[in-house]
UniProtKB/Swiss-Prot annotation:
The gene is rplE. GO terms for biological process: translation. The keyword RNA-binding applies. This is Large ribosomal subunit protein uL5. GO terms for molecular function: rRNA binding; structural constituent of ribosome; tRNA binding.
């Protein structure tokens, strides 16, 4: 079992029950999935960029990526419907907990001038999004072998009904929020 999942079951559930007064442990919010997305607008001109970005995302997450395609044509961006414009990975179960553990304890401290993640990027329904400016914060990526520094979006989807519940869940899981 992943270290963070074990910690969730033993420490986080009782803490959330006492804080929010849940009557049943099944009412406690749980993480459903983590979606890691890389939008690559420059992939329109050069398709090889997409391959290298997909390889990096596979190394970071340990799971096969899905290539995202344009939903509609946009003439100003020289974009046609069906063109590959990014890649994404959806992590669930054990891999989700392992990724979050690595992200919190290894990757986030490697960000320059890191003072904590923003507490304001909840969506109103208990989901949290983080933007990462460079993929080199992950230890799986070797700085010498990358072509270009790319960012990514990380969305943490929870079963929480409110932002306060989701914030408490992530805080107990170890996400360092800015005060």
């Amino acid at each position: 079992m992943a270290r963070l999942k074990d910690y969730y079951k033993k420490e986080v559930i009782p803490a959330l029950i006492s804080e929010f007064g849940y009557k049943n442990p099944m009412q406690v919010p749980v993480m459903k999935k983590i979606v890691v997305n890389m939008g690559l607008g420059e992939a329109i001109q050069n398709v090889k960029i997409l391959d290298s970005a997909a390889g990096e995302l596979e190394m970071i997450t340990g799971q096969k990526v899905v290539i995202t395609k344009a939903k509609r044509s946009i003439a100003t961006f020289k974009l046609r419907k069906g063109m590959s414009i990014g890649c994404r990975v959806t992590l669930r179960r054990e891999r989700m907990y392992e990724f979050l553990d690595r992200f919190i304890n290894v990757a986030l401290p490697r960000i320059r001038d890191f003072r904590g993640v923003s507490p304001n990027t909840f969506d109103g329904r208990g989901n949290y999004s983080i933007g990462v400016k460079e993929q080199i914060i992950f230890p799986e990526i070797e700085y010498d072998k990358i072509e270009k520094i790319r960012g990514m979006n990380i969305a943490i989807v929870t079963s929480a009904n409110t932002d306060e519940e989701a914030r408490a869940l992530l805080k107990f899981m170890g996400v360092p929020f800015r005060s």
